[in-house]
Amino acid sequence: MAEDAHTEDLSTQTPQQEGLPERLRVHSLARVLGTTSRRVLDALAEFDGRQRSAHSTVDKADAERVRAALTESPAAETPPEEAPAAETPVADLVVVQAEQVEVVTVSEAGPAEPAEPAEPEAPAAEAEAEAETEVADEAETPEPTFRGAVLVGDEPESRLILEHANIPPARETQTERPDYLPLFVAPQPVSFEPAVVDDEDEDDDTETGAESDFDSGADSDSDDDQADRPRRRRRGRRGRGRGRGEQNDDATSDADTDSTEDQTDGDEQESGEDSDDSGDEDSTTTEGGTRRRRRRRRRKSGSGDSDDAVSPDDPPNTVVHERAPRTERSDKSDDSEIQGISGSTRLEAKRQRRRDGRDAGRRRPPILSEAEFLARREAVERTMIVRDKVRTEPPHEGARYTQIAVLEDGVVVEHFVTSAASASLVGNIYLGIVQNVLPSMEAAFVDIGRGRNGVLYAGEVNWEAAGLGGQNRKIEQALKPGDYVVVQVSKDPVGHKGARLTTQVSLAGRYLVYVPGASSTGISRKLPDTERQRLKEILREVVPSDAGVIIRTASEGVKEEDIRSDVERLQKRWSEIEAKAAEVTEKKAGAAVALYEEPDVLVKVIRDLFNEDFSSLIVSGDEAWNTINSYVEAVAPDLMPRLTKYEPAGPDAPDVFAVHRIDEQLAKAMDRKVWLPSGGTLVIDRTEAMTVVDVNTGKFTGSGGNLEQTVTRNNLEAAEEIVRQLRLRDIGGIVVIDFIDMVLESNRDLVLRRLTEALARDRTRHQVSEVTSLGLVQLTRKRLGTGLVEAFSTACTHCGGRGIVLHGDPIDSASSNGGRKSDSSGGGGSGGGRRGKRGKKGAARTEEVHVAKVPDHTPGEHPMFKAMAAANGKHEGDEDHEDHEDHETAEDTTAAEVRDDTRDEHDADERAHVVTAAVGAAGDEDLDDSDEDSDLDSDEESDDESDEDEIELDDDEDELDEDIEVIGDSDDSDDSDDSDEDDDSDDSDDDSDEDEDSDSDEDEEPVREVYEPPVTAPRARVRRRAAARPAGPPSHD
């Protein structure tokens, strides 16, 4: 439309110019004429009676008429005493406007200069108030309300008037509206101090774009008109300083124009009465846009404003905190450089972990009440079984070792093995020799006489003993190469990592742990509150001042004399260790010495684990019985009734592990894949960095409900089994668990809570971390000793433990899979279900040339060929003498009609006869048995590769998990959707295929009776035609 056309708002045309534009808007015409939009609208209404708005478009003729009418009107209405002002032409006023624009343009580049006062025009403004009030009362033409400020030379005109005019002091508010008001006289003059125009004003106004210029220009006269009314405060201007006025004008120009285009004159009067409130509201809603513009200006300039500088966008008394740029903050180094910390990195890491734990809301486990403590103890029946066994493999053939198994409700949850080869070093105390100190690693390597050096980190150094309690704690200041240092092994060597050492020595007893040099005591939170209070009173009298203790759970109900004797025994042992270390240090023998070694694993497990929680302790073997019996009688005679010695019924009777089915459970624990009772699976992989557990549904398809319920049940079952596997395999370090994705947050919390409750039975130190963004559960666990797999396995000498075979040439995975399946199907017909049948089909086609022992059927006996011969006018007996190519021509004419119906039947017949001949030559094996064997083989392959019915929802529903190997498989992709039930039903009929139905199976029976041929040598050309599957008589192989 014409009114939507964008016109130049910043027009500087004056009446001195020869002509007006062909088309222009009302507000632009009012600006050119130096009057208000209301007067222009009134003049236009007098001409034709039409109702217009400030955005209406007028042509040149109407504009000339309005200019003529408005030029004559002021001269006629001006009083005689104001004749000098009336004689002043309007053109002069416009010239002054143009000059004023030039002054503003210059002032933007430099400091603002006060303009000439506009006092001569003030009386004219007072005189015109009465006339314009009368016109405003009579006029009822609708006119939308326009807010904002017109931009002349990138500045609002109203701002130019206030900033560049020496305005007289404020006077009483006028009660009458002036009839005519020149553009450059402030309707409500206020005292104002000129402010320095910042360079950011240009950016602020420029960023608003052409639309902001258009809207603000259209609203200038409307603002002037509203400002003439009594008690009207100009939004963002009066009494609020330049800063807030600029903010309101700039921020509201875009929003107000769009929201007020369709309002009427009555709306304008209502908005005029509420202008104060609306102005404040608009400034609040658009404050975010102003802040964004400030940020853009900072990014353009490259640096922010100083704290002392006042931003023009902020109101007075506003405290602005601006973040200093990174370039100013990092004076010493650049962002690309690596930053360091003062002091020990490992000590800082400890402090950071504590802070992160507090920030994350992690709390210590709650102290149990006595009822909860007894309920937890009685909830599970625990049994400990010990077996002595003789080695049967070199190099220590004939040696004895001891196995210890802990059962909870008949299920093995922990396993320990003790032997000379797998002896644990944890707890041993050595007088080591420092080999080298690495300040950059904050670690020292110490020779402890075990072949491989142990590592001592800065976080494990006893700084008080080293004399660096209050100084800068650096490991190079505490240790030097060649120094003797008393260290204790805190972690066994694993893989290529040496033993972990610490100088904070602790001695474990039956009821407590003695810590020399410590000053604090600790009590296990697994004890009830009443027992903790009793033990605290005992420790105040028992513990010496130069040591600390940690109470174990085994001290529950123990008398004060037993605890005192335990403390005195451990204190005496520490005195002996110190004396021996001082003696060796004085001699300077130059070799590491073992100061104290922990007892045998058997004694350690009995000391640490066997308490009132166990209902019985069953021991098999004389040597183990003597050791356990003597130790328990010495330290815990109240537990003697729970000891039982196992005596086999005869020499061939099963041992104690076989009776409790422990060997069977240990054998399953050696596997990589663990089957859940419901059919789900766990895949446990151990790497150098962490242990990863993957949860799969396996053959678990649910027992009702939707997919979310099925997945949650599988995850709940997996959470308990994962904790059991961690304890049984003694997996330590970082453990990451990939549960199947659940949609509901409540189900995720339920699984995590079940995992935490199961870990409460684990006596080792563990911590469940947060769930990652990918849905992985992280936890850490302290290793007790040698793991189950590590104790009974060694790395493969061929592949180095990687489990792969390397070749010199690249291996084609497709050909290798196809060869494996064809070999297995040829040997025993492996591959259950449809996969097995397709494999057998391929094998039959490959071996058809070698097995060809079945003679070709006489074509004339087939009913279809009889009909073909009759149609061609030939005799049945003449068909044998015809050339083979004539047969192919006749067959091709009918192949398109019957090939789709008989293709599967012929294929099934061929496979049946070929397999029959092959089996007869091999020994007349049963086809059903071969199918069952192939089904078993396929199940074994699916364990290693994929399950056809396995549901995997781990990372994304649209992505294929590695457990569903559809891509790259030798079979068709649609077989992956087949279930085991379908495979079992298909195995009962070896001739069925996924495209066949019961009707096709019924049709196969009479065909087999018709095609029983005598065993003769087949023709080679017919064999080639049968391989190509023509629509003709099938070849009976």
From Swiss-Prot:
CDD domains: S1_RNase_E (cd04453). Residues 427-504 form the S1 motif domain. Residues 127-141, 196-226, 248-284, 879-891, 923-1006 have a biased composition (Acidic residues). Residues 561-589 form a coiled coil. It catalyses: Endonucleolytic cleavage of single-stranded RNA in A- and U-rich regions. Binds 1 Mg(2+) ion per subunit. Binds 2 Zn(2+) ions per homotetramer. Zinc ions are bound between subunits. Residues 68-90, 106-126 have a biased composition (Low complexity). Its EC number is 3.1.26.12. Its cofactor is Mg(2+); Zn(2+). Residues 1-23, 47-90, 106-369, 810-1037 are annotated as: Disordered. It is found in: Cytoplasm. It comes from the Bacteria. GO terms for biological process: mRNA processing; rRNA processing; tRNA processing. GO terms for cellular component: cytoplasm. Mg(2+) binds at D694, D738. Disruption phenotype: Essential, it cannot be deleted. Depletion experiments show decreased processing of furA-katG operon mRNA, altered processing of pre-16S rRNA, minor effects on pre-23S rRNA processing. A double rnj-rne depletion mutant has decreased amounts of mature 5S rRNA. Depletion experiments show a decrease in growth rate and decreased expression levels of many transcripts, and suggests rne and hupB are coregulated. The keyword Coiled coil applies. Pfam families: RNase_E_G (PF10150). One of its GO terms (molecular function) is RNA nuclease activity. Residues 47-67, 320-335, 844-864, 897-913 have a biased composition (Basic and acidic residues). Belongs to the RNase E/G family. PANTHER family: RIBONUCLEASE, RIBONUCLEASE G. Endoribonuclease that plays a central role in RNA processing and decay. Plays a major role in pre-16S rRNA maturation, probably generating the mature 5'-end, and a minor role in pre-5S and pre-23S rRNA maturation. Probably also processes tRNA. RNase E and HupB jointly contribute to cellular adaptation to changing growth conditions and survival during antibiotic treatment. Overexpression or depletion leads to changes in gene expression; overexpression induces metabolic slowdown and cell stress while depleted strains grow less well than induced strains. This is Ribonuclease E. It comes from Mycolicibacterium smegmatis (strain ATCC 700084 / mc(2)155). The gene is rne.
